[in-house]
């Protein structure tokens, strides 16, 4: 069976699953230097993605469109070529506890000169399906809890087992937008307007809080206002909880909460306020998860999957793992909506077969494209050992290999690699990428060496947990040490078939150091480079390696 999942709104993507195997997933931001979070506003993008991967729309057995905003159903206004099309979709959240797999059928999916029928499952269902079906629990057939916390919903807990999944409870009445909304009122992204929502702010704030400290007096203010605005018996809190299905009113309530916070905390250092806000939400998450498990005991459910945009918060993921409530915690590399097309396709598989495992690779994104390299760049064959030598000479390299990684984080397929041995390298990488000085640079490290350098240093192939850099190594690899000593670590086996693992092995032979700086290769505010030509046109790194060829800028020396 061949299923095509489609995510039309922000983080637009097309994914095809065939007989239980992920064939590809094309996120629109990773095509043609598109903007981050690019939506699909023309169905021609679906036709193009299918064609690029050798699939004809007529050969798809079932199209599935991810659901979106709406209490009973959603609506999408798109184009097919130049023709306006209106498509019905499922709502954001299931309508009853056992309704995750309730679907809405539609017609009018116009792809080229043909019109197809489709199904649509709730948006939350795609998160549950993508998280569980890619997990080790699906492979072993074990049950799991699944936490979904997205921008405009409360954190929702589900129980997945066999052929069914059911809603357990909402942990507490705070929408995921709260994290980024705090940045409208405190810190470097403070705004005078409530508009101009930036999906990238939450991650930047996560970096900024390393400059601050948690203070219980600030946390106490957030706790008091939380009761007044969200959780208590006040008229304000009751109205908020009653209108949660209205995304505009729920966001306005979050803004009101932080506006009230700003009135009481205006004299505090913004970095301390944001650090305390982060901690307040983290403690609330951990405490309410523990309460949920105490009041809703589920035999055998000692596994946890995490999905939704808040699943990109590595500190919260680690805090949940460190509670001891779970034997194992799984976060896919695409917990946010970048995984929703995959999840939409999985919904149909689940409806037919139950929560079966998906055969997948994180390197299932778009293939590298051909393109004309700018005049003056010198191209020559280049071995992996030669790449390692360039890196050992303290020169960064844009490293492009095979198919792109899935999700928002560069994992060695569309990366800028660099030696981590000087503190200046972090500043240099932030400068060439037009990033703030406090932003961290991630390490990519050989898995077997990671416990020597990081704590816990456990396998983390997708950069989804927090690690502390051990003291002897903080001076050896300062470029990957964040301001609070932490690191957003990616580990990779030295036996991996991916070329970036070979680079690390060769670099270790030359230097004794088993890690490198790893940051995404892209224009500022755009998706990953689709080609070597794009990286050369960008031109802010003098060496570009692409599947065996090294491109050198005219001013560069090897």
From Swiss-Prot:
GO terms for biological process: biosynthetic process. It is an enzyme of class 2 (transferase). Pfam families: Carbam_trans_C, Carbam_trans_N. The keyword Transferase applies. One of its GO terms (molecular function) is transferase activity. Keywords: Nodulation, Plasmid, Transferase. Its EC number is 2.1.3.-. NCBIfam families: nodul_NodU. Belongs to the NodU/CmcH family. Involved in 6-O-carbamoylation of Nod-factors. This is Nodulation protein U. It comes from Sinorhizobium fredii (strain NBRC 101917 / NGR234). The lineage of its organism: Bacteria, Pseudomonadati, Pseudomonadota, Alphaproteobacteria, Hyphomicrobiales.
